[in-house]
Amino acid sequence: LKLVRNEATLGMPKVSILMPAYNAERYIGTAIESVLSQSYDDWELIIVDDASDDNTGAICERYASKDKRIKTLRHTENKGISIGKNEALRHASGDYIAFCDDDDIMASKTLEDNLYLVEENNAQIARWSYKTVKISSENVVIGEIPRICRNNIYHNREEIFRDYENVHEVLSCDWTGLYDRKFLNRHNIKFNEKYRYGGEDTEFNILTLQYVERMVMSSEIY
């Protein structure tokens, strides 16, 4: 797989990965390491620390000091997850937007595989399957809940809504998608800042469905 950059965008990252963070010292290092492990390395990671009162900020700064692709922003007061995501969107410079929450783990080929899908199919969004992992206080896996969508390519909104049951499988999470940044900007798609502690990504994804023309979906769990 070889993805070729347009000369006009050389020097800019292909993908901006946005990570809101709050009091995540226990697991944010694992989330950042999963980004660093990506087989495709033309990315930037923008972390917005929403005034954490634990060691989250220090952990993020330590990673940023070692890798120039990692950028950190810090709020002086807690503003909620939607404001943090919108701020990260404003600072993003990549052709595509991906999300990784502070307790997520990105499979190593998430970016490589889904960049291929979105560009090969001239799509505005790629979406993939995922699983939720339950972990005990001793960091022991105690359960897994997979959410699987079928492979499909949608060429217009009518096709998407006819197959809404499949689309709905992964609609509640922004971190199961790769989004064309120009598409988001053209339609002024951003997060509703009334959501402070969750639910913002479902509304965000529903908003994208009002405008998207081509979308590709993968049954692969990332």
Regions found by a protein language model. Give the residues of each.
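N-proximal low-complexity "stem/linker" segments adjacent to membrane-targeting elements
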Residues: 1-36
